[in-house]
Amino acid sequence: MTTDLNQNPYLVRAQQLLCRVPLIDGHNDFPFIIRGLYQNNLTRASLNDLPIGQTDISRLRQGSVGGQFWSAYVPNPVHSDKESDEAYLECLRQTLQQIDVIHRMVSEHPDVFGLAQSAADVWKIFRAGRIASLIGIEGLHQIAHSPSALRMMHKLGVRYATLCHTKNNRYCDSAVDRHTSSPWSEYGGQTHDPGDEPSRNVRTGFHSLTLKYLTAVHGRIVDLSHTSEATQRDAIAISKAPVIFSHSASSSLTPSPRNVTDEILHQLKRNGGLIMVCFLRDLVNSADDANTTGSRVVDHILYIAETIGYDHVGIGSDFDGMLEGPLGLDDVSRFPELVADLFRRGVSEERIEKIVGLNTLRVMKQVEDVAVREQAEGSTGVLCDVVKPIWTAEQRQMLAEQGRTRGLRP
């Protein structure tokens, strides 16, 4: 991948295309870099040119980024019981901090960013010359077992939810967690025995309701990156709306539990969903590839496109979730070179437009439409938190007596 604009006609075409269609990246952990470097104190931060990481305003502009899903990532609790409140409430607190820092990043740089909550918002912000900023959470451990928290996160702009990260949770299994000792049947899950695979899925009970509710709450996208294959299979079967993989790649090209099998890809196509190809070296390299290059990312994009069609592939870098990206595609400034390589390989302009952003916008709009329809039909109820009693039996009796004096029964 060359960076010489004068010597690369494909790069010229790439820059022209990215002026017309927003390049929307499915996953970037820049907010976690801000947390680590500045403890979320933006008064100390210069976001224009950061000394570390793969993202800052200067490089976003160089990379012609039109839209970005910022991850409000918080790690899984360490050594905690799945049902203990304390560890998960801390995850929820930190999640709110990360959502807040994204909001402040946008509000303190209004000439650069705009908060997008719909596909229409993305177009409006992009056409105004700004970067449409969307929010995702990376694992349902971040909601602390609280549907109320999930609803409030939507009001704060969270538009996709990854079902899990690197640990199993009460909703589904992770691709990389082999620990299966907790009593899953309490929550309605089915057990099966696929060898070394995690032993739970999302098909029944609480999990199924939660999955449907994710979509029905005003159009939240279900993200299956990091989930086990069994979870992927069941989630796609359950979902009435397109799902995404926000940062994954093909397991046929690079075998990894984090990547997606051809079988799941074909299910994803039938669902109308989208896989956004990750740049993480371990997910895109080949066995004999000592130095992973950006061209390897293009290999994955083209393999997926040829397997299930150009309507179902996008870009999900995972920048700032890795120490270094592929050679030639090592930070957000290099996106145009990825597009140039697609041109060089003979991909049509129409298909590249789909890859860089139109597919993502289609999925967003379809999920929004499903949510509107589900709410209009009243087909999805309201999930409620388990709320601990706040009154004693005596207090309840006293209040009930007051009601009875008015001819009412509580």
From Swiss-Prot:
Disordered: region residues: 180-200
A Pfam family of this chain: Peptidase_M19
Binding residues for substrate: H165, R258, D318
Enzyme class of the recorded protein, top EC level: hydrolase
A GO MF term: metal ion binding
Knockout or disruption consequences: Impairs the production of acetylaranotin and accumulates chemically stable intermediate cyclo-L-phe-L-phe or shunt products such as 2-hydroxy-2'-ene-cyclo-L-Phe-L-Phe and 2-imino-10'-hydroxy-cyclo-L-Phe-L-Phe.
Positions with a binding annotation for Zn(2+): H27, D29, E138
Its EC number(s): 3.4.13.19
Gene Ontology process terms (BP): proteolysis
The keyword Zinc is assigned to this record: yes
SUPFAM superfamilies for this protein: Metallo-dependent hydrolases
Pathway(s) per entry: Mycotoxin biosynthesis
Cofactor: Zn(2+)
Chemical reaction(s) catalysed: an L-aminoacyl-L-amino acid + H2O = 2 an L-alpha-amino acid
Keywords of the record: Dipeptidase, Hydrolase, Metal-binding, Metalloprotease, Protease, Zinc
Protein family: Belongs to the metallo-dependent hydrolases superfamily. Peptidase M19 family.
Function: Dipeptidase; part of the gene cluster that mediates the biosynthesis of acetylaranotin, a member of the epipolythiodioxopiperazine (ETP) class of toxins characterized by a disulfide-bridged cyclic dipeptide. The first step of acetylaranotin biosynthesis is performed by the NRPS ataP which produces diketopiperazine cyclo-L-Phe-L-Phe via the condensation of 2 phenylalanines (L-Phe). The ataC domain of ataTC then catalyzes the formation of bishydroxylation of cyclo-L-Phe-L-Phe.
Protein name per Swiss-Prot or TrEMBL: Dipeptidase ataJ
Organism this protein belongs to: Aspergillus terreus (strain NIH 2624 / FGSC A1156)
Phylogenetic classification of the source organism: Eukaryota, Fungi, Dikarya, Ascomycota, Pezizomycotina
